[in-house]
């Protein structure tokens, strides 16, 4: 079973409280999502492998540690997931970025995939799927399904807020993946929104309705 972790660092929790506020501007919302994603990246990347390397300091030659060169991929779920990419990418600039686009069918209310653009060697990469919200779990499950169909096996799901219903649904569908969030909220309301949540992350990121 993959792990589920709430990253409760004080800086993350402080910024998340501002992010939730109804009066937070689009500009500030965008910057906060970027900052929280970067801070979460510290914990999400904790198990990246290291290797020893000999370097020359101004004083002496020494053996130190660096990332082993394991291939990474950041895969945001469009469109809101885009807001998390740059923050995480600033920590691992060599990572490739793929995209999975979805829309919600108005009749079935289920997510429908309309775009998949991934690195050719996605099956060889450690993948970080990003979406600010894990609500019903439908989009997350479809995204992981899509990645696994293409041979991906090492997948982590990273979100800012999650509903218990969505976490359970994703764990039931894909018990092997790790899930990271900055907050496990109370529940979903009758419209499928996370409570207390932060509203529609895509609209708030891009200033749309």
Swiss-Prot record:
It holds the Pfam family UPRTase. The lineage of its organism: Bacteria, Bacillati, Bacillota, Bacilli, Lactobacillales. CDD domains: PRTases_typeI. Catalyzes the conversion of uracil and 5-phospho-alpha-D-ribose 1-diphosphate (PRPP) to UMP and diphosphate. Signal peptide: none annotated. 5-phospho-alpha-D-ribose 1-diphosphate binds at residues 79, 104, 131-139, 200. It comes from Streptococcus thermophilus (strain ATCC BAA-250 / LMG 18311). The keyword Transferase applies. InterPro entries: PRibTrfase_dom, PRTase-like, Upp_B, UPRTase/APRTase, Ura_phspho_trans. It catalyses: UMP + diphosphate = 5-phospho-alpha-D-ribose 1-diphosphate + uracil. GO terms for molecular function: GTP binding; magnesium ion binding; uracil phosphoribosyltransferase activity. PANTHER family: ADENINE PHOSPHORIBOSYLTRANSFERASE (PTHR32315), URACIL PHOSPHORIBOSYLTRANSFERASE, CHLOROPLASTIC (PTHR32315:SF4). This is Uracil phosphoribosyltransferase.
